A protein has these predicted regions:
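Class I SAM-dependent methyltransferase core
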Residues: 276-277
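Short acidic-hydrophobic, aromatic-tinged amphipathic segments that line or gate anion-handling sites
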Residues: 46-47, 104-108, 194
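A transmembrane-helix-recognition feature enriched in membrane-embedded lipid enzymes
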Residues: 1-46, 96-97, 236, 240-253
Length: 278
C-alpha cells in the first residue's frame, strides 16, 4: 500500500522518470530484505563463495518453489527487474508497482522485449527469471524453458545461477496461507560468462547443460540439509499426531525433543537399505 501511494506521489514530482524508478526499486529491495529479516521462526542462510556483488548486469536464474522466491531474489540487489507471469502482472495488489518498476510480462514471447531489456541493462540493471516458468508443488526442479538463455545470448549477458532451498516447505504452493518453520537457504553459484563455451555455444545447449548443473547442485544441497537439525522434519513428524488427541500430541513433542530429534537413528540408518523391525 505504501509503495502504491509513493508511485502516486512521485508521478507529480518534477523529477526524471528514470530516477523515480530507481528509487522505487531501492524501496522494493529494502522492503523484501525487511520481510525476510523479520521472519524469526525461519533459519536463513546465504552462501556466496565467489563474493558476487551483482554490480555487473547479468541474467539471474533460479529454481521456483514458492512466492518467497521473489522476495529472496529482490533482496539480493536493488538493481534488479524480473520477468513475471500473468497473475503477478495483473495483480490488484502489486501489479501497478511492478509495471512502474519496469518488470516484464513476456506472455507474447521474449523476442518482443529484447530491445527494451537492452536499455534497462544499459542502466545497470540485472534481469531475474525463473526458467521453470511456474512454482513446483513438491520442491523438485522441473524442465527449464529456453527464454532466459535466449536473452543471455541476444544481450550478451553473463548468467548467475541461484539455488533456492526450503522455501516450498515454509510457504507451499498448495497452502499459500500456511506459514511454517523451516530453512531458507540461498546459494549463489559462480557467474557463467556470456562467451564461456563450457556449457555450449547455443542457447539451446546452454539450457540443457546449465539446467543439469543446477539440478546436480540442488540435489547436493538437499542431501546436506536432510538432517535432524532441519526443523521441517520435526514439524512433519509432529503433524502426524495433532489429530490423535492433545495428550499423544504433546507426548510426541516432548519425546522427540528428549531423544534429540532421533539424531542417533539418522546417523546409524543408511539412506538406502533394507530395514527390519524385530
Amino acid at each position: 500500500l505504501f509503495l502504491r501511494l509513493l508511485i502516486a506521489v512521485m508521478t507529480l514530482l518534477p523529477i526524471r522518470k528514470a530516477y523515480k524508478k530507481q528509487v522505487l526499486c531501492q524501496l522494493i529491495h529494502v522492503t523484501c530484505k525487511s520481510l525476510i529479516h523479520i521472519a524469526t521462526f525461519v533459519h536463513k542462510e546465504k552462501i556466496n563463495r565467489t563474493g558476487e556483488t551483482f554490480k555487473k548486469p547479468a541474467i539471474l536464474i533460479a529454481n521456483h518453489q514458492s512466492f518467497i522466491d521473489i522476495l529472496v531474489l529482490l533482496a539480493l540487489t536493488p538493481k534488479l527487474v524480473m520477468v513475471t507471469n500473468h497473475w503477478v502482472w495483473h495483480s490488484p495488489f502489486f501489479g501497478a508497482i511492478i509495471r512502474y518498476a519496469d518488470f516484464y510480462y513476456v506472455g507474447d514471447g521474449y523476442e518482443l522485449y529484447v530491445e527494451r531489456m537492452r536499455q534497462k541493462v544499459k542502466e545497470g540493471y540485472s534481469i531475474a527469471i525463473f526458467p521453470e516458468g511456474t512454482r513446483t508443488y513438491d520442491g523438485r526442479m522441473k524442465r527449464f524453458h529456453k527464454g532466459a538463455f535466449y536473452l543471455s545470448e541476444k544481450l550478451q549477458l553473463d548468467i548467475i545461477p541461484v539455488i533456492l532451498y526450503g522455501n516450498c516447505k515454509i510457504i507451499a504452493k498448495a497452502q499459500p496461507f500456511n506459514v511454517r518453520k523451516g530453512i531458507m537457504l540461498t546459494e549463489i553459484l559462480p557467474r557463467i560468462p556470456a562467451n564461456d563455451a563450457t556449457y555450449g555455444t547455443t542457447y539451446q545447449e546452454r539450457t540443457k547443460s546449465i539446467s543439469a548443473r543446477m539440478k546436480k547442485e540442488y540435489a547436493r544441497i538437499c542431501r546436506e540439509q536432510s538432517t535432524t537439525d532441519n526443523p521441517v522434519f520435526y514439524e512433519n513428524l509432529v503433524q502426524n499426531y495433532i489429530y490423535k488427541g492433545p495428550v499423544e500430541e504433546w507426548y510426541i513433542r516432548i519425546k522427540v525433543k528428549m531423544e534429540d530429534n532421533y539424531r542417533l537413528f539418522n546417523q546409524l540408518v543408511p539412506v538406502k537399505g533394507q530395514i527390519t523391525d524385530i
